[in-house]
A protein has these predicted regions:
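Short helix-loop-beta connector
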Residues: 51-58, 80, 140-141
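Glycine-rich Rossmann-fold phosphate-binding loop(s) that bind the pyrophosphate
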Residues: 64-65
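Short acidic low-complexity segments
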Residues: 105-120, 135-136
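Adenosine-phosphate binding glycine-rich loop
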Residues: 156-245
Length: 246
């Protein structure tokens, strides 16, 4: 329900059920929103570490929900940022989120605008938007973008021009072909193709494809989520729970 965030509720309600592989019985039910936020943030942090400029100083986040907070945590873990710019549909939600960022991470946070977006070295988009959140001309060269909000073919956070002019890395190419509106829409307009994807994040990590080649190129990580990430996180949680009990 798209009105849920205004009510202080998650956009989507979900749960993750964990089963014992040897016995077949359910051993835990995890909050799906928390699992999604943690694993999505972790992957964005990894992508930022592999693709953002080493001297990145300014981060920007579009959105003020649980996912946005995990994105901020992730990029702060990956780079020594000095401030975060917050972009939201309302001034009130942006101000509140700036306070959350400062109180949680002890880093300066301020409301962003079109002009200040050019300062950003790392941008995270975490919204259910159906139209681009910014214009390509608002970006600086060398920026890295984590686009994680759109997960349906009709959703779009990133301008077509930005997709065309970026080195695009994805979490899973087959999933993006079905769900990544940020990539599907440019294809429908005849301006891009999946053959132009530089590679998957795993390939960058393994050294099979290059990451950032220069401080001047724009890199974009598109993630729609991957079930193996949920499994990996659930496994970590269960191991920690079992260790805490012993």
């Amino acid at each position: 329900n798209y009105s849920n965030p205004q009510k202080g509720l998650p956009l989507l309600h979900s749960s993750v059920q964990v089963f014992d592989a040897s016995k077949g019985n359910m051993v835990a039910t995890l909050d799906g929103e928390s699992v999604t936020a943690i694993r999505t943030g972790a992957v964005s942090g990894l992508a930022t570490g592999m693709l953002a400029k080493k001297d990145a100083k300014v981060g920007a986040v579009f959105g003020t929900g649980v996912q946005a907070k995990s994105q901020v945590e992730a990029i702060l873990a990956a780079r020594n940022l000095e401030k975060i710019l917050v972009f939201s549909r309302t001034k009130k939600s942006a101000e509140l989120f700036c306070n959350v960022i400062y109180d949680t991470f002890s880093i300066k946070a301020s409301i962003g605008d079109k002009d200040s977006l050019k300062e950003a070295d790392v941008i995270c988009t975490a919204t259910p938007s159906k139209k681009p959140l910014f214009a390509h001309g608002d970006l600086s060269m060398g920026v890295h973008i984590n686009a994680i909000g759109s997960f349906k073919p009709y959703m779009q956070e990133i301008p077509v021009e930005t997709i065309i002019n970026s080195k695009v890395i994805v979490d899973k190419i087959e999933s993006c072909k079905v769900e990544a509106g940020d990539l599907i829409i440019p294809i429908k307009e005849g301006k891009w193709s999946f053959d132009m994807v530089h590679g998957e994040l795993g390939q960058v990590i393994l050294g099979e494809v290059s990451g950032r080649d220069s401080d001047g190129e724009i890199t974009l990580f598109k993630s729609v989520g991957n079930a193996i990430q949920d499994l990996a996180l659930a496994n970590i949680i269960m191991k920690k729970m079992n260790n805490d009990r012993s």
